[in-house]
Regions:
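N-terminal leader/targeting segments and the immediate start of mature chains
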Residues: 22-58, 71, 199-212
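Gly/Pro-enriched, hydrophobic low-complexity segments
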Residues: 91, 123-209
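Flexible, surface-exposed loop/linker segments and immediately adjacent secondary-structure boundaries
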Residues: 99-138
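An acidic-aromatic
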Residues: 64-113, 174-177
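A generic structural motif
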Residues: 47-51, 76-78, 95-97, 144-146, ...
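Beta-strand elements of well-folded, non-transmembrane domains
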Residues: 50-52, 67-71, 147, 161
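Extended beta-sheet lipid-handling architectures
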Residues: 44-48, 60-62, 75, 87, ...
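Classical Sec-dependent N-terminal signal peptides that target proteins to the secretory pathway
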Residues: 5-25
Length: 212
């Protein structure tokens, strides 16, 4: 879920083969910025594939994602393990049902969060170069960090028919992760109460207030 923030490393994703590495024109950048500006909320089912450095799938996961500006989201994995990541905009709470454990952390600790990046126009303009390719009327956007020694790894977004179809990024373990979305819905009414946590009494709770 989170992008790696230390020394710049990455696996060359197979999707990069399709890119012409042409910097986006003003209109093309506006295409993406207009796209994210129009989205106040979205929800989707997803299937997630995690690959090792040889490109072999080592884990398949599935679940649901609900997002609301700014930085409120519920990322719920249902298979193979039941884990929830809940952000109320200030804190990220991880609920692991198998471990019966809850971890509460400051949102600022995860500034490299994939959702924080691709929905934040100011952050993108300041820290990333965008390149694009259009294949079968689908927009493939590659985000390359300007400061490769400090900031985030490359990540890719595929947009089709005004919907996010796929995201590919690196996780904290140098593994390539691809999230494939389905039933993608935008601008539905989502109440803030959805992002409040309900912790079972028998769960262990760990609070980490560190910002870094």
């Amino acid at each position: 879920m989170f992008l790696k923030q230390n020394k710049f490393k990455l696996i060359i994703f197979y999707l990069l083969l399709f890119f012409d590495n042409t910097a986006l024109s003003y209109d093309e950048k506006n295409f993406y910025y207009n796209f994210i500006d129009k989205i106040n909320t979205f929800s989707s089912k997803f299937i997630q594939h995690t690959y090792d450095e040889n490109g072999t799938i080592i884990k398949k996961s599935s679940g649901n994602l609900i997002y609301k500006k700014k930085l409120k989201y519920l990322l719920e994995y249902s298979k193979p393990n039941k884990v929830k990541f809940i952000s109320d905009g200030k804190f990220i709470t991880t609920i692991d049902e198998d471990l019966e454990q809850v971890i509460i952390q400051n949102q600022k600790k995860f500034y490299g969060n994939i959702f924080n990046i691709f929905t934040n126009k100011t952050l993108i303009e300041k820290n990333f170069n965008l390149t694009k390719s259009i294949i079968n009327n689908e927009h493939y956007l590659k985000f390359t960090p300007i400061d490769k020694d400090i900031y985030y790894n490359i990540f890719l977004i595929v947009i089709s028919n005004d919907k996010i179809k796929k995201i590919t990024f690196m996780n904290d373990f140098d593994q390539s992760v691809t999230m494939i979305f389905s039933d993608f819905m935008t601008n539905e009414i989502i109440l803030d109460s959805l992002f409040k946590i309900d912790i079972p009494d028998e769960f262990d709770v760990i609070v980490d207030n560190k910002k870094e």
